[in-house]
Amino acid sequence: MSILEKITSSPSECAEHLTNKDSCLSKKIQKELTSFLQKKETLGCDSESCVITHPAVKAYAQQKGLDLSKELETRFKAPGPRNNTGLLTNFNIDETLQRWAIKYTKFFNCPFSMMDFERVHYKFNQVDMVKVYKGEELQYVEGKVVKRPCNTFGCVLNTDFSTGTGKHWVAIFVDMRGDCWSIEYFNSAGNSPPGPVIRWMERVKQQLLKIHHTVKTLAVTNIRHQRSQTECGPYSLFYIRARLDNVSYAHFISARITDEDMYKFRTHLFRIA
């Protein structure tokens, strides 16, 4: 079985919380843009996202008072390097996690962080995990700030400092489901967590031990999965997505997941245009 078959995502460009994937668009927008959608080839398009981002369609929508930006944000996957090996930006990552937080209603999507989070203002270092669990921590979902109880937490960190341009993406996942809770660090290159992450994990562990009897920290780093120079972002997102879909962390320490798997996973992450 392919590793991608273990998760619930698909190559459709529609946001995953939509049940009808025949069209990503709302019925109102479909109706208003029927003529454009029927002749999308003449626009040089092969997807709905291409159609609604086309200058002619955007101009028409503006005249009609149609909010296409909301359609893109809530009914399509995030933009990003779907069909190439371009490096993922923090926008690609955060916008993907925001969309997953719509599908997974008990998932807390934390904005990205650089590795100097202990001295620079990042949400990651300010989160109280007990408040996350109880629904007292603010998070951004569907274009608005909300509070809701969450039993999973995910964040993608960069190993560079905020003064740099970025080096390597890694993942943090906190699982507050079941009897034994876990605070997990995943690095596709197989490197151990650096000091700031170790301290963060231990601090969060002490927070959670106040409300739950068993909490462990895990470094999921015993296998060097990544061999390329480009796939750390997809690997980090894949770890979070797999864990949300109840794939055990043990899967990542028992067999290598290939770069080729991540090339395919990109088509699950991003919309076509």
Swiss-Prot record:
Keywords for this protein: Host cytoplasm, Host-virus interaction, Hydrolase, Inhibition of host innate immune response by virus, Late protein, Protease, Thiol protease, Viral immunoevasion, Virion
UniProt main location, coarse: host cell
A GO term for molecular function: cysteine-type endopeptidase activity
Listed GO CC annotations: host cell cytoplasm; virion component
EC identifiers of the protein: 3.4.22.-
Pfam family, one: Peptidase_C48
Domain of life of the native organism: Viruses
GO terms under biological process: proteolysis; symbiont-mediated suppression of host innate immune response; viral protein processing
InterPro entries xrefs: Papain-like_cys_pep_sf (IPR038765), Peptidase_C48_C (IPR003653), VPRT (IPR016510)
Localization annotation: Host cytoplasm; Virion
Binding site for substrate: 226
The keyword NADP is annotated on this UniProt entry: no
UniProt-annotated catalytic positions: 168, 187, 232 (nucleophile)
Top EC class for this record: hydrolase
Induction annotation: Expressed in the late phase of the viral replicative cycle.
UniProt keyword annotation of Transcription present: no
Function summary: Cysteine protease that plays several role during infection including processing of the structural polyprotein or inhibition of the host immune response. Catalyzes the maturation of the pp220 and pp62 polyprotein precursors into core-shell proteins. Plays a role in the disruption of host pyroptosis via specific cleavage of gasdermin D/GSDMD. In addition, strongly decreases the host cGAS-STING signaling by targeting IKBKE via its enzymatic activity. Also impairs host FOXJ1-mediated antiviral effect via degradation of FOXJ1.
Protein family membership: Belongs to the peptidase C63 family.
Protein name in the entry: SUMO-1 cysteine protease S273R
Organism, as annotated: African swine fever virus (isolate Warthog/Namibia/Wart80/1980)
